[in-house]
Amino acid sequence: MTFLVDVNLPGFFSKFQHGDFIFVFNIDQQLADSELWKLALMNDYVILTRDMDFYNRAKESITFPKIIIFRFGNLKLNAMQKYFQENWNSIVDIIKENKLIFAWQHELEIIY
């Protein structure tokens, strides 16, 4: 599984530092959401984002890429790092069987 990390998530976390992660900021920091969507669909990438526009687009689409939307508010970087360390394996397990999830600070919510 390959994850496409949107520009609104920090790319320097150790959890993201291997070949399963592609960073939008390394492709084009100005990449439009529609282009990111197409890239994910064409390559079977999972979008990692904090942007609710992807949820809104998924609601109106017949086909959409797998999407994980992080809804944990404004965490400090060390708290965000801890969040990913504690929850990443569960997030991956859930997205394998689903299309769109909200990752809240204290729960994971399956949307589709």
PLM regions and their residue ranges:
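N-terminal first-folded block
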Residues: T2-V46
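Short glycine-/acidic-enriched loop or helix-start segments at secondary-structure transitions
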Residues: S14-K15, D33, R57-K59, A79, ...
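Residues at secondary-structure transition points
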Residues: Q30-E35, M52, L75, A79
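Mid-chain, well-packed structural core segment of small domains
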Residues: Y55-N89
